[in-house]
Structure formats: structure tokens, C-alpha cells
């Protein structure tokens, strides 16, 4: 079982003091060798996407796992060739700290326990990659960012699409304004969820479709606008399965407004299979259709180039290699903890708008 948040907060200071400045770790980072990574949480994403990608990465390799199910760790140890002694429980952060082969901990647990896992990893003197959403509130994000700074370690979020060439084309178009600024943006992302899972438990998921699927649209919209929204107006949609979605929303709609007058209308839900984004400017457009936010086979086109084709690759490999290289070289990445926090400010604002029925101004400081 995972330790409680109170237990982690109580021990963070001592762990950070003991391990944040380990000389051997600094030497490993500067050597040019692949950094060692430990997966924290061995669910479907770790086993189905991250593990295969780590067989292809050049800048980082899997050297350990942190899991509540040792059998899962044994399988990955055999596949990736690391010692079974490097399979740790969630209570063995002292051993993680002592393992000099581990440079990065990739937190892939449910969002409700991201903060406690990230705090523990920083306390163990490791860099951190944290899956999305970064946390279940902007306040938790602040705690995580502060812990990383105290430990002198880097934090990145698992925003794989920052390293995806299709979405990088959207970023390029927005920054160069080749078509002019994108003033009208629409996006939708969701799927049909019919059975119970941790994703509909508020304590673990933080929210419903918004924190799981809507966050992709938030990312895409901010890429297209090349800015952070200044306000949001949102409403929850009627539930078609109220007996299932007791604690969280099933579907919602929201509008984001930007300082230059651009607007983005977004839908997110667990009651339909949708994935799309459309950004329109005076001289052209960018369009992504299902699957636009998926792991592979993206269907994206622009008014200038038609359908884009960047070949076959693993997004997760590009993401982890890119982040590891930045950690090793001391260079910047776009998927920072601050960006993860920005998205949680927006999500907090969406839920506030639903509660109050009012337009909410978004404040990032």
C-alpha cells in the first residue's frame, strides 16, 4: 500500500537533507551515459507504453521499479535486464535513495497520490517525471515544485505530445503566425466509459473526464493560442449514467478566453468517442481529427500542407529521451512543473465555474 500524504510531508525534510546533493549522482548526470530511470507504478500505461519505449531510448534506461505488486516488477526486470533487488515497494524510498543507478523516478500512479510519490522521489534525491495531470489541485503543484527546488532536482510532466512532430507543427504555426494568430479554436476529447475504475473515484482521479481527457484539449488549445487563457466559463452536462458517475463529472463543456480576443470552445466526456482540434486563423487552419491525441496514427492536416505524415515512432520514446537529455545537460524542456501547474489552475477554474455558474478569471500567481 502507498504511504499517506501526512507521512510523506513529515519525512520529506530529512530525506532531502540526506540525499539531495549526492556527488555520485551528479557525476552520473554529467558523464553522457544513459540516465537510470525507475518507474513508480506499474499499471497499463507503464507496461503497455513506457516499458516498450524504454527498450528504444538512448538517453535513459529502466533500472528499477517501485510497485505494490512484486510479480509485475519481476517481469520488467527480466525484460530490461536489471537486478530483481531493484524492485521496491512504496515504503522503500530509503533504498531508492541509496541506489546510485537511479537518476530519475517516473511517477505513473493515480493523480490523487502523485504529490506524495513526487515528494518522496525528491526526498530521495532523484529527478522526477510525473504523469498528467500533475496533481489534483494547483496548491499540490506548488508543494511539488517547491520540493524539487529544495532538493535541487528537476521536474517534468508526462506531456508526450510536446515531443510529437504533429503537435510541434501546431506550436510552430502559432509562434510564427504563418497563418496569423489562431482566433477561433475548438477541441473535444473523450471516450465511452462504462465500468467502474479508479478514474471515477474523486480521491484518486481528482475529477472525471476533465482531468483524464480534457487536459489534452487544454494543452492543445494553449499551444494554438500560444498563450495562457485569462478566463473560463464552464458547465457540467447531464449524466447518462448517474449510478456510475457519482463522485465526478461524466461530461462538460467550457470556453477559454485569451487576452488577444481568441476563444476556445472545448468538450470533454466519458459518454462519446471523440478526439479533435480545429484552430482557425485569417490565412489558414490546423485540424486534428480522431485520433489526434493518441499514442500513434495521428490524423492531422493543415491548410498549407494537407495531411501531415511524420512516419512511425513512439511518442513516449521521444518524450523520455528528450527529458533525460535536458536533465543531463541542464537545458530546458517545455513540459515543466510550471506548465503542469498552469493546467491545474485552469482545471480548478473550470470546476469553480461549474460550482458558481459564473465566468472565472484565471490567476497564475
Enumerate the language-model features and the residues they cover:
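N-terminal Rossmann-like dinucleotide-binding module
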Residues: 12-80
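Predominantly a Rossmann-like dinucleotide-binding segment in NAD(P)-dependent oxidoreductases
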Residues: 33-34, 45-46, 161-245, 357
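Rossmann-fold dehydrogenase core element
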Residues: 143-160, 183
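Contiguous beta-strand/loop segments that form the cofactor/metal-binding neighborhood of enzyme cores
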Residues: 212, 218-294, 318-331
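C-terminal capping/lid region of NAD(P)-dependent oxidoreductase domains
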Residues: 153-154, 180-184, 352-365
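Beta-loop-alpha module in the N-terminal Rossmann-like domain of NAD(P)-dependent dehydrogenases
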Residues: 86-147
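N-terminal secretory signal peptides and thylakoid transit peptides that target proteins
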Residues: 1-16
Amino acid at each position: 500500500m502507498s504511504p499517506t500524504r501526512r507521512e510523506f510531508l513529515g519525512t520529506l525534510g530529512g530525506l532531502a537533507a540526506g540525499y539531495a546533493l549526492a556527488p555520485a549522482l551528479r557525476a552520473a548526470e554529467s558523464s553522457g551515459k544513459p540516465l537510470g530511470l525507475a518507474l513508480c507504478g506499474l499499471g497499463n500505461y507503464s507496461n503497455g507504453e513506457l516499458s516498450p519505449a524504454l527498450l528504444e531510448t538512448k538517453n535513459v534506461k529502466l533500472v528499477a521499479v517501485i510497485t505494490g505488486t512484486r510479480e509485475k516488477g519481476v517481469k520488467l526486470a527480466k525484460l530490461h535486464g536489471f537486478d530483481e533487488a531493484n524492485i521496491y515497494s512504496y515504503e522503500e524510498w530509503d533504498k531508492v535513495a541509496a541506489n546510485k543507478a537511479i537518476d530519475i523516478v517516473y511517477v505513473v500512479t493515480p493523480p490523487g497520490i502523485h504529490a506524495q510519490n513526487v515528494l518522496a522521489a525528491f526526498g530521495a534525491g532523484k529527478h522526477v517525471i510525473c504523469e498528467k495531470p500533475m496533481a489534483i489541485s494547483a496548491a499540490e503543484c506548488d508543494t511539488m515544485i517547491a520540493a524539487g527546488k529544495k532538493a535541487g532536482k528537476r521536474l517534468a510532466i508526462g506531456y508526450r505530445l510536446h515531443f510529437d512532430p504533429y503537435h510541434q507543427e501546431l506550436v510552430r504555426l502559432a509562434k510564427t503566425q504563418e497563418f496569423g494568430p489562431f482566433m477561433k479554436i475548438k477541441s473535444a476529447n473523450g471516450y465511452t466509459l462504462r465500468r467502474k475504475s479508479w478514474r471515477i473515484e474523486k480521491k484518486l482521479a481528482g475529477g472525471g473526464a476533465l482531468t483524464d481527457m480534457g487536459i489534452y484539449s487544454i494543452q492543445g488549445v494553449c499551444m494554438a493560442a500560444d498563450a495562457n487563457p485569462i478566463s473560463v466559463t464552464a458547465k457540467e452536462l447531464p449524466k447518462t449514467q448517474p449510478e456510475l458517475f457519482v463522485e465526478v463529472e461524466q461530461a462538460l463543456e467550457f470556453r477559454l478566453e485569451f487576452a488577444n480576443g481568441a476563444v476556445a470552445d472545448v468538450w470533454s466526456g466519458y459518454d462519446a468517442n471523440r478526439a479533435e482540434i480545429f484552430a482557425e486563423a485569417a490565412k489558414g487552419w490546423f485540424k486534428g481529427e480522431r485520433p489526434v491525441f493518441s499514442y500513434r496514427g495521428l490524423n492531422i492536416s493543415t491548410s498549407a500542407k494537407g495531411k501531415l505524415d511524420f512516419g512511425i515512432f513512439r511518442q513516449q520514446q521521444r518524450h523520455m529521451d528528450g527529458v533525460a537529455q535536458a536533465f543531463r545537460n541542464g537545458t530546458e524542456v517545455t513540459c515543466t512543473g510550471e506548465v503542469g501547474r498552469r493546467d491545474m489552475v485552469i482545471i480548478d477554474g473550470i470546476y469553480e465555474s461549474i460550482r458558481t455558474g459564473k465566468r472565472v478569471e484565471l490567476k497564475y500567481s
